[in-house]
Design a protein with these regions (language model features):
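N-terminal pre-catalytic "stem/leader" segment of glycosyltransferase-like enzymes
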Residues: 1-56
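A donor-sugar binding/catalytic signature common to diverse glycosyltransferases
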Residues: 11-13, 225-268
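Glycosyltransferases and closely related glycan-assembly transferases
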Residues: 20, 28, 77-91
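Alpha-helical membrane-targeting segments
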Residues: 37-64, 81-85, 268-274
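A nucleotide-sugar donor-handling region in carbohydrate enzymes
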Residues: 102-168
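Conserved catalytic-core segment of nucleotide-activated headgroup transferases in glycan assembly
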Residues: 161-193
Length: 286
C-alpha cells in the first residue's frame, strides 16, 4: 500500500517547521514543505475575517495530496482554500490555535496550556517537534573539534523577540551575565546557538561578550544545534520559545529557562513552563 501524501504549510520559522514535520514523520506520510507568503492586506487582516481566496497569498504548485498539515496564522487561509477547492476529499490538520472556527479543520492540535476544547481538538503536553534522540546523537561530532575537551559544556539556545519579550541589550546583558557566572563558577565552556528569530545584533553582542574561549555559532545551523544538544551537559533556552524547550526536553538533561521580563501578560508561556515543571522535566528558571 502506498503512503499518503501530505503538503506542509508554514511561515518558514524553525518552530513551525519542526511541528509540521514532526507530525508528518509520526504519521509516516510522504510530504513536501511549502513556505507560505501572504500579501500586505492579508497581513493586516486576522484570519477570521479574511476571505478564503488565493488572492491573499502567493500562488504555489500543489501536488497530488491526501492531507494538509499547517501551522501558524499565515498558513490558515491557504489550508482552507486548498481543502475547499480540491477535486478530492483531503484532510486538513492545523497546529496551534487558528483563530477561526475550529470546524474549518478536520483536526486542530494545540498545547494543553492553550485551554482549547472541541470534538476535533487534540491536546499535546508541549510543542510537537521532529527531533529524535537518534538524530541528535548522529550529529554529536559536528562541533567536537571546536570545543574545549578539558571542560564540560553549557548550551545557550536563543529564540527571538515577539510581542511578549524584547531582545534589547539590557535583557540580553542580564542573561549573558547569568550564563557567564554559571560557567565560571562550574568551569564550563559556553556554546551559543541562534535561531531564525534571533536578531543579528544579539548574535554580534554574544560574540563580543563571550570571547574566543567560548563558542558562538554565527548563523542558523541545524547540525550545530543538534550537536550542541548532544554535547552539552546543561541546556539553557530563552523563555520565548516553547518549541525549543520542548525539543530540549527530549534529551532528559537539566533545562534552565532564561527569563526575560514580559511586555504584556505572558500567562500562556507561564502555564506551559508550569506544566513542564509538574511533569518533572527539570525546568530551572534563571
Amino acid at each position: 500500500m502506498s503512503k499518503l501524501k501530505g503538503l506542509l504549510l508554514t511561515e518558514g520559522m524553525h518552530g513551525m517547521i519542526s511541528q509540521v514535520e514532526g507530525l508528518a514523520k509520526a504519521l509516516g506520510i510522504d510530504y513536501i514543505h511549502q513556505k507560505v507568503e501572504i500579501n500586505l492586506l492579508a497581513k493586516l487582516l486576522p484570519p477570521k475575517i479574511t476571505p478564503i481566496s488565493n488572492l491573499f497569498f502567493k500562488k504555489f504548485t500543489v501536488p497530488e495530496i491526501d492531507l494538509v498539515i499547517s501551522c501558524g496564522r499565515k498558513s490558515v487561509i491557504p489550508s482552507l482554500y486548498l481543502k475547499k477547492n480540491s477535486t478530492k476529499k483531503i484532510v486538513n490538520i492545523h497546529i496551534q490555535d487558528p483563530k477561526v472556527s475550529l470546524s474549518n479543520f478536520d483536526y486542530v492540535i494545540v498545547p494543553e496550556h492553550d485551554g482549547l476544547n472541541g470534538k476535533n481538538i487534540i491536546s499535546s503536553k508541549g510543542a510537537l517537534h521532529y527531533l529524535t534522540l537518534k538524530e541528535i546523537e548522529k550529529n554529536h561530532e559536528y562541533l567536537s573539534d571546536k570545543i574545549d575537551k578539558n571542560k564540560q559544556q553549557i548550551l545557550l539556545i536563543l529564540g527571538g523577540p515577539n510581542k511578549y519579550y524584547k531582545y534589547d541589550k539590557k535583557n540580553m546583558s542580564r542573561i549573558f551575565e547569568n550564563i557567564k557566572g554559571l560557567a565560571e563558577k562550574n568551569n564550563l565552556q559556553i556554546i551559543i546557538i541562534p535561531s531564525m528569530r534571533t536578531p543579528a545584533d544579539t548574535i554580534d553582542y554574544a560574540n563580543k561578550f563571550f570571547g574566543s574561549e567560548n563558542l558562538v555559532i554565527q548563523n542558523v545551523d541545524k547540525k550545530a544545534y543538534l550537536s550542541g544538544l548532544s554535547i552539552a551537559k546543561f541546556l539553557v533556552v530563552t523563555c520565548d520559545s516553547t518549541s525549543m524547550i520542548s525539543e530540549a526536553a527530549l534529551t532528559g538533561k537539566p533545562i534552565y529557562v532564561a527569563q526575560i521580563p514580559s511586555k504584556r501578560d505572558d500567562h500562556r508561556f507561564r502555564q506551559f513552563r508550569d506544566l513542564f515543571s509538574k511533569l518533572n522535566l527539570s525546568l530551572i528558571h534563571i
